[in-house]
Amino acid sequence: MKLTLEKELCGSILDIGGGGEGIIGRLYKSAVTAIDNVQEELDEAPDCCKKLLMDAAELDFDNESFDNVTFFYSLMYTDTETKEKALKEAGRVLKKGGRLIIWDYVITSAYPKAFLAELEIEFSGETVHTEYGIIGTGVEQDAEMLIKFCEENKMKMFEHEKYAEGFKLGFIK
């Protein structure tokens, strides 16, 4: 799948699961605080933004700390309970009027066969080829599940793009 990213966010950004390729950090640079719960993923990410080891389900930030919160293909690595908690925490640290943006895949099964998907991302004159994958039970997800969790936390959807294998969701607090 091919995805082109443009700068669409203004202000501070919390990128949840921002290790690895660090796409949001590379696009928005110093505006980003990237968190990941795996130190090796943070170490792998480019040094273009602030990086912190942290659990998305228990964010160590004050209420309404960020103008934007992003999940760039990171919720797929969590079980349903953690997805719900992470989205609740995202809403807590998001400023009133702030935006929550989610890019992710529809996953109907990741066991016994792993879920794997290739992604080509174009942004700021760069092209990154990567593959995301997960194996296990309880990681199934679709846009409707995430929409429900966000709406339960008083976020209003303003964008829903469908891709061949996934989706992009946008919410305002």
Language-model segments: residues:
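A short glycine-rich, Lys/Arg-flanked "PGG" loop and its adjoining helix->strand segment in the class I
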Residues: E84-K96
